[in-house]
Regions:
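Glycine-rich ThDP/TPP pyrophosphate-binding loop and its adjacent helix/strand module
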Residues: 1-89
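Conserved acidic/glycine
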Residues: 55-161
Length: 161
């Protein structure tokens, strides 16, 4: 929805899926002259996973398409807006991700038919959203990395170290 405003930098990230994309999103959001929104996948104990495997679960969420990684850069300085779809196409079924979490698995114990039906609906939703995101990436292709952005990334990294 924030992408529809046209002036908001928007990124969806998951550090466990792509630390580099996470860093790029924060640097780009900070450099953006306007509002920025970063939507981060954050595992928590309420998901019903062993927290030791949180980053792995983030990667599974991305690999199945439940949490695609993307960045939207609004038009600026004469450059057209860009939508970068940073994750690959879904490569595993949502079941491989969802049933690692008690919050999803519980329904299989009490109402297995409903759980199977809802999992099918979730997979259909993933497929539909992926189609929308690939369409956006084709409509607003990314230009090559701007030297100014690369320079600001180097500067930010040198300030951290």
């Amino acid at each position: 929805m924030a992408v529809a405003y046209g002036n908001v930098y928007v990124a969806q990230i998951a550090m466990g899926a792509s630390p580099q994309q996470t860093l790029d999103a924060f640097l780009e959001a900070e450099a953006h002259d306007g509002p920025s929104l970063i939507i981060a996948y954050s595992h928590c104990i309420a998901h019903g996973i062993n927290m030791r495997y949180g980053l792995r679960q983030q990667k599974l969420a991305t690999d199945c398409g439940h949490w695609p990684l993307y960045r939207f850069r609004p038009a600026s300085n004469g450059h057209a807006q860009e939508f970068m779809l940073d994750s690959a196409a879904p490569s595993i079924p949502i079941k491989a991700y969802a049933y690692n979490e008690i919050r999803y698995k519980m329904l299989t114990y009490t109402h297995p038919e409903a759980a199977a039906r809802l999992l099918d609906v979730a997979q259909q939703d993933i497929d539909q959203r992926w189609s929308v995101y690939t369409n956006m990436a084709e409509r607003w292709p990314a230009r090559s990395a701007a030297p100014a952005r690369a320079a600001s990334s180097r500067q930010a990294l040198s300030e951290v170290s």
